[in-house]
């Protein structure tokens, strides 16, 4: 399973970071809560045919 952390910044930039475990995804999402530059962080479980949203921060 692959996990993706989609970061949406105040300047409109969207960046995707990929992780091999939910723990890594959760840890990095927690760090996002301390950033003043991030509007939203979305945790996704990435599948072959569709993605599942696990959480949204922001």
Please give the residue ranges for each predicted region.
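Short, surface-exposed linear segments at secondary-structure transitions and domain or protein termini
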Residues: 23-32
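Short, mixed-charge low-complexity intrinsically disordered segments
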Residues: 32-58
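Short aromatic-glycine-(Arg/Gly/Cys) micro-motifs in beta-strand/loop hairpins
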Residues: 1-14, 46
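Serine/proline-rich low-complexity intrinsically disordered segments, especially terminal tails, linkers
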Residues: 6, 23, 37-38
